[in-house]
Amino acid sequence: MADVHELLDTWIANVKDEELLAELNTMKEQGDEDAITDAFFQDLAFGTAGLRGTIGAGTNRMNIYTVGRATQGFADYLNATFEHPTVAIARDSRNKGELFVKTTAAILAANGVTALVYPKISPVPTLSWAVRDLKCSGGICMTASHNPAPYNGYKAYGPDGCQITSEAADAISKAIAETDAFTGVKSMDFDEAVEQGLVKWIDDSCLERYYEAVLARGVTNLSAEEIAGAPLKLVYTPLNGTGLIPVTTVLERAGITDVTVVPEQKEPNGDFPTCPYPNPEIRQAMQKGIDLCEQVHPDLLLATDPDADRVGVAVKNGDDYLLLTGNEMGVLLLDYICKTRAARGEDLTKKVAVTTIVSSAMVDALAEEYGFELRRCLTGFKYIGDIITSLSDTGEVDRFIFGFEESYGYLAGDHVRDKDAVSTSLLICQMAQYYKLQGKNLADAMHELYEKYGYYHNKTISLSYPGAEGAAKMAGIMAGLRENPPAELAGSKIEAVVDYNTCVNGLPKANVIEFDLEGGNKGIVRPSGTEPKIKLYIFAKGADAAEADAVLDSIEESGRKLLA
C-alpha cells in the first residue's frame, strides 16, 4: 500500500465532497500524524460481514468513495455470477445512511444491476426478507449494528438472504482491490436512474408480507381467553433506531397493545444522544428504559438495537431490574419453544437447533432433555443462516426450530436468514405471557432452569486495541497464544487447547483459540470481525450462582493479564 502521506495528497487532489475535503485539508494543515496514519494505513477490509468503520475521510473510513469502491466490486461480482442481477438495499438510522444508499444504488444502476430500495429506514431482517421475497441476486444494508454513533457499515447478502459466503466475499474483495476509488467506479445520477427504472422503490406490500410471515411463526398454545386474562404490559425502546414501527406493528396485531415507548429514544437519530453505545447488551443503553419501568411497572422491558436485529430484555428482580444475558434469553426461548411444541405432540427428536461455539453449555443440557439435534457453528449469524439454507436445500427446513448467538441475536423461523429482533420480540412476549399465567416472570423462569440444569454462567470481555498499533498488537497476541499457550488459567490446569485455525468438527477455519480447563470450565479468545477488539468468552459452571461467578471472576482476571 502507498505511503499514507501520498494517499492523503491523492485524496485531496481527487475528492469532490466538500465535507470530506475539508477534513483532509485539516489533517494536512495540522500535520496530525496519528490521524493521517489511522485514516490511511489500510483499506477497510471487505469480508463476509461487508464493511464497517468510522465515518470520515480516508481509505480506512466509511465514506462515499470507500462505499463506491466496494459497490463497484460487488457489481462486478454480480454481473459475473448472475444474468440480469437485482439487489435489495436498506439502511438503518445511522448518519450518512441515506447518502450511502443513493451512492450505492447509482453505481449499481450504472453497472446494469437493478437496485430495489426501501424508501425509509428498515431493520436488517426486512432486508433479508426482501432479498428472498423479491427474488434478488443479493442485498445490501447500510448499518453498523450496535456500534457507537461514529460508525456505519455496509452489510452484503447473497440470494438466500444470508450474509455472503466466504467464497463470495473473497471474489468481491479481489474485484475491489482491482478498482481505483476515483477512476474505476461507474456511476450515474440517482434521480436519472430512478426515472429510467434502474432504481426502484420497494413498496409497502413487501413489508406487509414480512409482517404476515412473522405473525405466522409466533409460538404459543394460549387461547385468546387465557391471553386476555393475563394481559402483558410492556416498555419498549428502539434506541433511536429502526425498530419502532415494525416491532409495535407486530405486537399490536398479536394483541399486545399495552406498550409504553421510551420517549427520548423513540425517534430515529444517528447521533444516539441518550446512549453513545446503542447496544442492548449493556445497562447504559437500557437505563432510560429501566427508569421508565420504575414509573409504569411493566412485565418486561424490550430494547432493540439500531438495525433491529438484536433484542435485549430486562425484568424486575427484587428491588432492581435484571438484564437477561444473550445466553440466558437463548436458553429460555429454546426451552419455551420445546415445551410448546412438545405439548402439541411434535417429535422433537427430528428437530434441529443451532447455536455457536461461544454460546452457553446449558444448550447441551436442553438437547439431552428434549432430544433435538444441536448443531454448533462459528461465531456470526451467517453460519446459522447457512445451516438453515442447507436444511432448505434438502427439503428439511421444517426441522429447524431455533437459532441463537450469545450476542443477543435470535431467530425462530425460516422466513429470513439473519437474526430478527422483530419476530423475537413477539416470541419473547408470548413466552412472558405463558409464564405470567403461572405467576412468574422471566427471571423466575431462568432461576428454575438454573436449579434444574446447573448454574452455567458466562461472561464476555472485550479489550480494545485502536489504530495501526492496535492491529499489530492484536495479531501478536493471537500468534503468541498459538506459539506459547499458557499451561494454566486462573490456577486451573488447561487440559486442551483447540485452535479453530485448523479444521475442528468440520467447521471452516477461524481465528479462534479455545482453552479447556479442568472442571469443565473454559475460555475462548477471538478477535472481533467488526471492531479493533479481542473478545474473551468465559464459561463456568457452579453448584450455585456464587460459585459460578467466583470462577468467572478468577478466569477474567487471568485472561485480562494474558491479553494485555
Named regions from a protein language model:
Residues 126-184, 306, 317, 406:
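Active-site phosphate-binding/coordination module
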